[in-house]
Amino acid sequence: MINSFKAEFHCFVVAHNNVDDYRICELNVGNELSSLLPYFEQFDTYELALARVPVEFRPNDEQL
């Protein structure tokens, strides 16, 4: 099942499964994020979104 999240304002969204899969996406107003991951959390800044992701699942510098 594909879940979706539609941005109402510019934001960063953490999509995750509460276990070991976390994705951070930047969305603008009206843009939609579709994912197989069941949970979406919205944050105002990338730093706040990154803080939500457990340390062991955060991207390293080469992935940014």
Predicted regions and their residues:
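Short N-terminal "domain-start" leader segments
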Residues: M1-L33
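A short, charged, amphipathic alpha-helix used as a generic interaction element across diverse proteins
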Residues: V29-L64
